[in-house]
Each structure stands twice: as structure tokens, then as C-alpha cells.
């Protein structure tokens, strides 16, 4: 199943709600991800531009997009960024295909 990096930044309202009532939001979102056929592989809270970082497996880009839209529509997030990930073997295969594409950069 494809892997995705999801980076989530909470809105001010989202942080206010979490400070008022601290809770494990990873466990709160797990059922929604699983309902779409996905699985949380790992999750962390983070400092910086994004507050939560997830590595998830989702059946397809459509499913990964659906959960990102659901997160964004909930109102607690100011940003949701989803990045498709390649395994090392997939990346090597992509490199081999790139070599065979005969693409030439402009001179």
C-alpha cells in the first residue's frame, strides 16, 4: 500500500481546544484513516511549521486526498500537506526509468 507523509499545522482555534482539553489526537483520527482503508504507521508532534507529522499507508491517492480534505474541513487545522513517498527500491526503479526516458534538458 502506498505511503504518505502528512504534515499538519493546527489553527489557533485548534490549539485553544487542545489546551483547554488535552487529548491524543492521533488516536482520535485513527478511525477516520482506517475507515478509508488506511493505517497510521507512525506519528509525532513537532516544533516548527507543522505541529503533527504522520506516516500513513493509504490505498490510493484519492484516499490520501480524502483524509487530507477531511482534516482541513474540520476547522482545527490551518494547513495540511500530504506528500507521496517512494520506498528506496521504488526510487531506484524511477531512476532507471528516468535514464531510459531520453529526456534532454534545453541547452
Language-model-detected regions and their locations in the chain:
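A compositional/biophysical signature of low hydrophobicity enriched in polar/charged and small residues
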Residues: 1-107
Amino acid at each position: 500500500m502506498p505511503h504518505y507523509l502528512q504534515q499538519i499545522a493546527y489553527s489557533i482555534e485548534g490549539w485553544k481546544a487542545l489546551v483547554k482539553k488535552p487529548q491524543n489526537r492521533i488516536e482520535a483520527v485513527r478511525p477516520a484513516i482506517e475507515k478509508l482503508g488506511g493505517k497510521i504507521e507512525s506519528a509525532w508532534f513537532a516544533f516548527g511549521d507543522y505541529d503533527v507529522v504522520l506516516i500513513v499507508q493509504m490505498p490510493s491517492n484519492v484516499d490520501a486526498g480524502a483524509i487530507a480534505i477531511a482534516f482541513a474541513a474540520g476547522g482545527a487545522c490551518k494547513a495540511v500537506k500530504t506528500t507521496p513517498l517512494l520506498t528506496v527500491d521504488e526510487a531506484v526503479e524511477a531512476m532507471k526509468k528516468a535514464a531510459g526516458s531520453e529526456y534532454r534538458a534545453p541547452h
